[in-house]
Amino acid sequence: MRTTYMAKPNEVERKWYVVDAAGKTLGRLASEVAALLRGKHKPTFTPHVDCGDHVIVINADKVELTGKKLTKKLYYRHSLHPGGLKVRTALEMRTNYPEQMIERAVRGMLPKGSLGRQMFKKLHVYRGSEHPHQAQKPEVYELRG
């Protein structure tokens, strides 16, 4: 009887991909980026091993939201002090903190736990079209849709 192949952490080969977020819908972008970070696009995918690739997201400030989400969607955070609840709309987030907007969407689609945190470290988000990772020779990744 054959056994299923299980990748080992030291056998994983990592590539670098560049994803352009300009004009893309936030959730659709985040789900594909999360799949790349997990390594689900590889035939050697193993659920309990971090076999994903590095992903660079550029033009984070040009990401789109559908419907009235720019004004209606709220981002919450709390300082853990009494009265420390902070609320921002999606428009404020896209204007001032577009990197955090994409990071929060992708983080929610990764596994919860130490493996998910390890995968999240391979995400690099930048506001403009420039990034400091030219030395890694990243490939351009075209999103489906």
UniProtKB/Swiss-Prot annotation:
Keywords: Ribonucleoprotein, Ribosomal protein. GO terms for cellular component: cytosolic large ribosomal subunit. The keyword Nucleotide-binding does not apply. Signal peptide: none annotated. It comes from the Bacteria. It holds the Pfam family Ribosomal_L13. GO terms for molecular function: mRNA binding; structural constituent of ribosome. GO terms for biological process: negative regulation of translation; translation. PANTHER family: LARGE RIBOSOMAL SUBUNIT PROTEIN UL13M, RIBOSOMAL PROTEIN L13. This protein is one of the early assembly proteins of the 50S ribosomal subunit, although it is not seen to bind rRNA by itself. It is important during the early stages of 50S assembly. Belongs to the universal ribosomal protein uL13 family. Part of the 50S ribosomal subunit. This is Large ribosomal subunit protein uL13. It comes from Geobacillus thermodenitrificans (strain NG80-2).
